[in-house]
Swiss-Prot record:
InterPro entries according to UniProt: ANF_lig-bd_rcpt (IPR001828), GPCR_3 (IPR000337), GPCR_3_9-Cys_dom (IPR011500), GPCR_3_9-Cys_sf (IPR038550), GPCR_3_C (IPR017978), GPCR_3_CS (IPR017979), GPCR_3_mGluR7 (IPR001883), GPCR_3_mtglu_rcpt (IPR000162)
Protein name: Metabotropic glutamate receptor 7
GO molecular function: glutamate receptor activity; group III metabotropic glutamate receptor activity; protein dimerization activity
Binding-site residues, L-glutamate: S159, A180, S181, T182, Y230, D314, K407
Record's subcellular location: Cell membrane
Keywords, sorted A to Z: Cell membrane, Disulfide bond, G-protein coupled receptor, Glycoprotein, Membrane, Receptor, Sensory transduction, Signal, Transducer, Transmembrane, Transmembrane helix
PROSITE patterns: G_PROTEIN_RECEP_F3_1, G_PROTEIN_RECEP_F3_2, G_PROTEIN_RECEP_F3_3, G_PROTEIN_RECEP_F3_4
Length: 922
């Protein structure tokens, strides 16, 4: 027997010419007849046309035994479904009238090689036998009983069994319609051209399972397959489709061996292997009932209740038997099953079956014992685990649990598909003939196959039954989840369906302990917003999360990109947002102090100017040089005004005024002071040499010189306007800190630090020159035209600006650059103006207002007096020890009359000096 099985397996795999195979099969058929003593059971129903049936009535037996325990659901339910369908068809006057369908139903014992041996029964009638040499003992030729001719086969169940049988049936052109085989390989019309099925292939099922896994957010799963065509091809399809879809990785693929010595140890080892990838909690299963039951038991022994997330194929479907005593480990399992409906007529039929009315089913007594857990008194009972006697009065559904097996509908549809094909064939070939005509008997399987592929009728579920060119049914699946908690009716719950696309009701799903949140099955948890994935080589579903830093944002899952120049990342770094625009506000502490000082200075300047205008003809005002005083006060006023321009909101007009007035106020002030100190210096220097008055010392000349100095500043500003017109910009570099949250865009005029210094540079040059003259005239008697106050003013101003430069440039890289530089510049200009105003004009205003008695005209001096004073000053400066109790008190008349100048008296200077009165010149 073992050798026969091996030979059968080789024959189905090797390609022999049909004639050779037929000769070999003749011998095999004879051998098979001899095996009927070994497995004599089969169901025979007489009819005009006989259909074959292959069902897994029993499970696989242990080593050396072909058949094991009876399969109540997958075996008996399905077998009875065929008998029920035959009864319905034979009683239907509109389907195959005057033709009775018979059957020859065999047990495959869930084993492909055993099924192949059994299927040889179907081809016996087609094998021609040479009996010329055969004689009976009396010398007469024997009379052979011709076996029934099987025109088509319903089955088998397992894909590996169907493949093995299909290889034989195609040689004899016997059409085959399977009710459960879903292996993708059976869609190959070149190898399995006589094979059809009323269930969709696993390629559709695998696509549906991939869609389910992705819909649940799982990207890292393991696969588990029973050894054989169904399991291995199913996993192969799932793996291929998942790779094509992308975003789904297979942690490991585990195969359950068909032949195993110790089942418990093997399944415990499989569970341990699955736990090697703990993050891969989802397990996609393409396995038979027994393997499913064993794997659940092993998971329970490993105390992994709630860890694994099972995704079962249609071999699991909505079956109860594999879950018996393992309901807790199966909690939350998602299963798929070809779309079906409960056939109510079958329920009534099956629950009415008894030992008395179902004698045609040779395995029904064995089913009765297993179903009711009792022992029949008839001989041949196989029930050894109980002493309870069966009464025969038990009833299915009352004394035992009953639920219609998931493939019953498809068994019925397969029988009806064969019947419809025979019906159309009978109408075409036997139009005027009652029953099966000779043409139909001789038509052959190829013609019947053509009719099978063209059937189209509403099946038992109300859905169309049809086949494509490969013999496959369209893909329609129901999706279930096994739920036991928080439900009044524990069991499978319909949660969706798949017909070319997935429809999944996630809100109806629940997991262990009634949890509604979908548990993860990912290699790495999703990255947080603002992080990118860095995949690991070889495992695209495993990654490390790297945060986008600096001014980067998360462009997509894998990439961080820099924000545009004027933007920064948002709070969670999933996009960019505009950088806030800032300017120096009036209410800012950085602006309040300069504005306050400027307002005080403006008020003081206006007060001084008003006082001078009011007392314009008084001696003090006249002696201070009225023309240059008003020019100087104007410059001081502009120095205060620039504070408001520097703080005002930048626009083109404001920026234009900034350029003009930034250095103009200082330029006017220091141009006037320089003219004054230069005049004093020239007068005293000229007095040392001769009594001739120097040139350009009149008020008009002084104004002309001052205007010339100021015009240089204005010329530079106009050139600046021409080369670089005023404009406003938003400077993002100035406040682009390391922390993007602190980044700011500064709205400002298009003026660089260098341009500011250049604009002030000319004024600083005037200031330095004026300081030099102040130093040179430091020896002039203090009453001679403010030489000493001007000197103190310039010294103080230099100190202010020496402090300004390092602060201004030292904060160029500071985040507070806008505030510090603006405040420093405005305060420096305010201080410079205040120093000049305070030292040069406040004493005069004090005398004018509070001591008018001192505001009287003093003696006017001619240039001769100036010369004498200059000579005196020179000598006193060389002989400080000769000064009597301090410096000589002298006064330089503001309006020296050159016509009254007399040559200087060259004589020794006594301790007392006699001054000559010179008539005043107005």
């Amino acid at each position: 027997m073992v050798q026969l099985r091996k030979l059968l397996r080789v024959l189905t795999l090797m390609k022999f010419p049909c004639c050779v195979l037929e000769v070999l099969l003749c011998a095999l058929a004879a051998a098979a007849r001899g095996q009927e003593m070994y497995a004599p059971h089969s169901i025979r129903i007489e009819g005009d046309v006989t259909l074959g049936g292959l069902f897994p009535v029993h499970a696989k037996g242990p080593s050396g035994v072909p058949c094991g325990d009876i399969k109540r659901e997958n075996g008996i339910h399905r077998l009875e479904a065929m008998l029920y369908a035959l009864d319905q068809i034979n009683s239907d006057p509109n389907l195959l009238p005057n033709v009775t369908l018979g059957a020859r139903i065999l047990d495959t014992c869930s084993r492909d090689t055993y099924a192949l041996e059994q299927s040889l029964t179907f081809v016996q009638a087609l094998i021609q036998k040479d009996t010329s040499d055969v004689r009976c003992t009396n010398g007469e030729p024997p009379v052979f009983v011709k076996p029934e001719k099987v025109v088509g086969v319903i089955g088998a169940s397992g894909s590996s069994v169907s493949i093995m049988v299909a290889n034989i049936l195609r040689l004899f052109q016997i059409p085959q319609i399977s009710y459960a085989s879903t292996a993708p390989g059976l869609s190959d019309d070149r190898r399995y051209d006589f094979f059809s099925r009323v269930v969709p292939p696993d390629s559709f099922q695998a696509q549906a399972m991939v869609d389910i896994v992705k819909a649940l957010g799982w990207n890292y799963v393991s696969t588990l397959a029973s050894e054989g065509s169904y399991g291995e091809k199913g996993v192969e399809s799932f793996t291929r489709i998942s790779k094509e879809a992308g975003g789904l990785c297979i942690a490991q693929s585990v195969r359950i061996p068909q032949e195993r010595k110790d089942r418990t140890i093997d399944f415990d080892r499989i569970i341990k292997q699955l736990l090697d990838t703990p993050n891969s909690r989802a397990v996609v299963i393409f396995a038979n009932d027994e393997d499913i039951k064993q794997i659940l038991a092993a998971a329970k022994r490993a105390d992994q209740v709630g860890h694994f997330l099972w995704v079962g194929s249609d071999s699991w479907g909505s079956k109860i038997n594999p879950l018996h005593q393992h309901e807790d480990i199966a909690e939350g399992a998602i299963t798929i099953q070809p779309k079906r409906a409960t056939v109510e007529g079958f329920d009534a039929y099956f629950t009415s079956r008894t030992l008395e009315n179902n004698r045609r089913n040779v395995w029904f007594a064995e089913y009765w014992e297993e179903n009711f857990n009792c022992k029949l008194t008839i001989g041949g009972s196989k029930k050894e685990d109980t002493d309870r006697k069966c009464t025969g009065q038990e009833r299915i559904g009352k004394d035992s649990n009953y639920e219609q097996e998931g493939k019953v509908q498809f068994v019925i549809d397969a029988v009806y598909a064969m019947a419809h094909a025979l019906h159309h064939m009978n109408k075409d070939l036997c139009a005027d003939y009652r029953g099966v005509c000779p043409e139909m008997e001789q038509a052959g399987g190829k013609k019947l196959l053509k009719y099978i592929r063209n059937v189209n009728f509403n099946g038992s579920a109300g859905t169309p039954v049809m086949f494509n060119k490969n013999g496959d049914a369209p893909g329609r699946y129901d999706i279930f989840q096994y739920q036991t908690t928080n439900t009044s009716n524990p069991g499978y719950r319909l949660i969706g369906q798949w017909t070319d696309e997935l429809q999944l009701n996630i809100e109806d799903m629940q997991w262990g302990k009634g949890v509604r949140e979908i548990p993860p099955s990912v290699c790495t948890l999703p990255c947080k917003p603002g992080q990118r994935k860095k995949t690991q080589k070889g495992t695209p579903c495993c990654w490390t999360c790297e945060p986008c830093d600096g001014y980067q944002y998360q462009f997509d899952e894998m990439t961080c990109q820099h924000c545009p120049y004027d933007q920064r990342p948002n709070e969670n770094r999933t996009g960019c947002q505009d950088i806030p625009i800032i300017k120096l506000e009036w209410h800012s502490p950085w602006a309040v102090i300069p504005v306050f000082l400027a307002m005080l200075g403006i008020i003081a300047t206006i007060f001084v100017m008003a006082t001078f205008i009011r007392y314009n003809d008084t001696p003090i005002v006249r002696a201070s040089g009225r023309e240059l005083s008003y020019v100087l006060l104007t410059g001081i006023f502009l120095c205060y005004i620039i504070t408001f321009l520097m703080i005002a909101k930048p626009d083109v007009a404001v920026c234009s005024f900034r350029r003009v007035f930034l250095g103009l106020g200082m330029c006017i002030s220091y141009a006037a002071l320089l003219t004054k100190t230069n005049r004093i210096y020239r007068i005293f220097e000229q007095g040392k040499k001769s009594v001739t008055a120097p040139r350009l010392i009149s008020p008009t000349s002084q104004l002309a010189i001052t205007s010339s100095l100021i015009s240089v500043q204005l010329l530079g500003v106009f050139i600046w306007f021409g080369v670089d017109p005023p404009n406003i910009i938003i400077d993002y570099d100035e406040h682009k800190t390391m922390n993007p949250e602190q980044a700011r865009g500064v709205l400002k005029c298009d003026i660089t630090d260098l341009q500011i210094i250049c604009s002030l540079g000319y004024s600083i040059l005037l200031m330095v020159t004026c300081t030099v003259y102040a130093i040179k005239t430091r020896g002039v008697p203090e009453n001679f035209n403010e030489a000493k106050p001007i000197g103190f003013t310039m010294y103080t101003t230099c100190i202010v600006w020496l402090a300004f430069i390092p602060i201004f440039f030292g904060t160029a890289q500071s985040a507070e650059k806008l505030y510090i530089q603006t405040t420093t510049l405005t305060i420096s200009m305010n201080l410079s103006a205040s120093v000049a105003l305070g030292m040069l004009y406040m004493p005069k205003v004090y005398i004018i207002i509070f001591h008018p008695e001192l505001n009287v005209q003093k003696r006017k001096r001619s240039f001769k007096a100036v010369v004498t004073a200059a000579t005196m000053s020179s000598r006193l400066s060389h002989k400080p020890s000769d000064r009597p109790n301090g410096e000589a008190k002298t006064e330089l008349c503001e309006n020296v009359d050159p016509n009254n100048c007399i040559p200087p008296v060259r004589k020794s200077v006594q301790k007392s000096v006699t001054w000559y009165t010179i008539p005043p010149t107005v």
